[in-house]
């Protein structure tokens, strides 16, 4: 059972914003479809005064569809063009006859400025909790829904910063054959084409907007503007790695022609080479690419994400999610080299099964996959069977983290070892960061200052297979869950940090929890950051094993330095039948593996 007060607050927050209310009516103001209807939307030739029942009588905008509650067998056919209104879908199909939203081949451009907005509270993303976030497609309490396009031919494009698809309290939703991109990416980029003396010449990829004034360059676009500098990476396409540096503060920039610039160094020599790309963004996490909240049975199949803003696909308190044949990478013939500000696939407090198979992940500034829960600090015990807990990280708070019936573990902040359990019987949201939990049983007597709790009801199993991870300056997979984890037959290419990282902490990101059953099998690791597999919980005063029952078998490591596996504070570890090489020569296991 979900916390009704927190759920209501979430829904009210999602309805907050400047979008015209007539375009996004409440459920009680909508008309119930009888089912098995086909409607058409044509932004170029349609008219919202039409019946919408045929291509020749299509609606012009999403507004008429937003006045319906869809039913089994309904199909909404959306023709390409410019969409000034978001699709705000309510309805319920059946498994045999789902509600189908069919985006026809072509470019579907969602315009900036008039889209539906809300204030969802998003894990690891909440730098701007009160800033409305635009949404192109929103599924609200929808069930048995199919979003579909033609692979390689149907593109959903954002003109400005927005969430592509936001779903909350949805069930049995699939996304099939869709491409997602920005007309004007919020990641600034340029490609160095020539270096001569103290000057570099560079090309800015199509679609990335900028201005040059007084020797400085400013990136801008609908909903986003910042001066070149700050957080940046240099990507070397020849090696597929991030290397080099560039400081625009020591340069004078001139525009030679549209999309062409020169960069003259006031001191020193050019620090980049022809073929290298400069990637630049601000660090304010104010949005994400996709947001899936309190939803279950979600399938992504044969989709391509070319670019998304902020944290990537965020699944928060969702159940049973599968990504199959998903590719996250720029368009093949584009000069762009980045597809995501932060993580590709981010899972916070999920349960059921997370399956990632046959995917290509990367081209981001952070991890390809991150699976974790959240540690909340115990700050008060107002009654023997009550505790007050607090979200501690400034980018993670405000969401419904507990419900009656959820089981919690009490965890030592020093050792990260759980020492007691309890069950939630009541939840009271005190403010955006503090929650009072009523528990079925009294609190243990040995709670120490700064100890934390984890919602262990919401912990998923994870199976990642046949997936490529590349063009990432950080980690490949971050995995902390007590349910079974299997990573098999994946390929990790030159990640800047460990390819697989298992941590758990109660002092930094507060990302939980313990690992109890993990197998890493038959994967290939090529020149990744070391240790390539690192299992090191952040326990300030370790006492006993935090993680246990981990098997690393049958993997192939091509090493840069020599450390393939580093493990601490973990019991029941098996590292066997792995192959280690460096510079083409085999390395014995005892030199490549460090377990203590």
Placement of each model-derived feature along the sequence:
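Ser/Thr/Gly-rich low-complexity blocks that favor extended beta-strand/coil architectures
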Residues: 182-183, 207-256, 397-432
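Extracellular beta-strand-rich solenoid/capping regions of secreted or surface-exposed proteins
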Residues: 68, 84-102, 108-146, 157-176, ...
